[in-house]
């Protein structure tokens, strides 16, 4: 099965991707992993991508698509794949459709994990880190035994600048604006399935699993 996994930051994509991989053995392919592998292998496209990344510039779509093509052509993807972080735009989605068509394949499911904005903000702003040892906590999911203190060494816990509510809210709004056209594109293709990501982790996976087994709409 050929899957695209979508969801805003904090929606739990990584957790659910791990569960899909564990059950189905489908390779989890993220944009970052693809770039790192291509660069490490020293492929022509990897060298090109590195030149843009070293300058702090966006990697052009044609290079990104080429790297995706190389990755999806590997034998571990013969029975399917789980794409995470790609495509990000409608032109990328159209290019992905074309390259898959050239391979006699197509996207079967686009799974979009939906979580309310307020819940995402709570999830993303709850992280706290020890100033002494760097241990990470979460006020909702993994709180310290003593508020504001590290369990290991009693060090002061702090919130990273990019975890503050204003920064998180802005990041979410940017992501929402970017993904809206892509969601509409896949909805028009009748492959988009919205999943309620506010449930317990196990229940979210149950809903995903129903779709992957072909028993859901």
Swiss-Prot record:
It is an enzyme of class 2 (transferase). Residues 126-163 are annotated as: LID. ATP binds at residues 10-15, 127, 136-137, 199. Its main location: cytoplasm. SUPFAM superfamilies: P-loop containing nucleoside triphosphate hydrolases. It catalyses: AMP + ATP = 2 ADP. It is found in: Cytoplasm. One of its GO terms (molecular function) is ATP binding. Pathway: Purine metabolism; AMP biosynthesis via salvage pathway; AMP from ADP: step 1/1. Consists of three domains, a large central CORE domain and two small peripheral domains, NMPbind and LID, which undergo movements during catalysis. The LID domain closes over the site of phosphoryl transfer upon ATP binding. Assembling and dissambling the active center during each catalytic cycle provides an effective means to prevent ATP hydrolysis. Some bacteria have evolved a zinc-coordinating structure that stabilizes the LID domain. Catalyzes the reversible transfer of the terminal phosphate group between ATP and AMP. Plays an important role in cellular energy homeostasis and in adenine nucleotide metabolism. NCBIfam families: adk, PRK00279.1-2, PRK00279.1-3, PRK14527.1. Belongs to the adenylate kinase family. This is Adenylate kinase. The gene is adk.
